[in-house]
From Swiss-Prot:
GO cellular component annotations of the record: plasma membrane
Keywords: Cell membrane, Membrane
Location within or outside the cell: Cell membrane
InterPro entries the UniProt entry points to: Membr_insert_effic_factor_YidD
Domain of life: Bacteria
UniProt topology in membrane: Peripheral membrane protein
NCBIfam families the record matches: membrane protein insertion efficiency factor YidD (TIGR00278)
Function: Could be involved in insertion of integral membrane proteins into the membrane.
Name of the protein in question: Putative membrane protein insertion efficiency factor
Family, similarity comment: Belongs to the UPF0161 family.
Amino acid sequence: MKQILLLIIRGYQKFISPMFPPSCRYYPTCSNYSLQAIKRFGAIKGGLMGVARILRCHPFVRGGYDPVPDNFSLKRNQKNSKPRN
């Protein structure tokens, strides 16, 4: 399951994402965040973290640096978050 999710995200990054202008408000991008979360926490927890991150990525949020936390959480990583310039 983990490998399937990683393959889907990499496919999105390679074939779908390049067709649109960059729009992610966070660094790392939502797809990279999802890859890292799934690798670190597995398909279920990492997948949930990726979905939560995508739901947070909208025009009404400041965005900024939001790395995958050391411990499982569906909230933004406030410890290291700084607005993007």
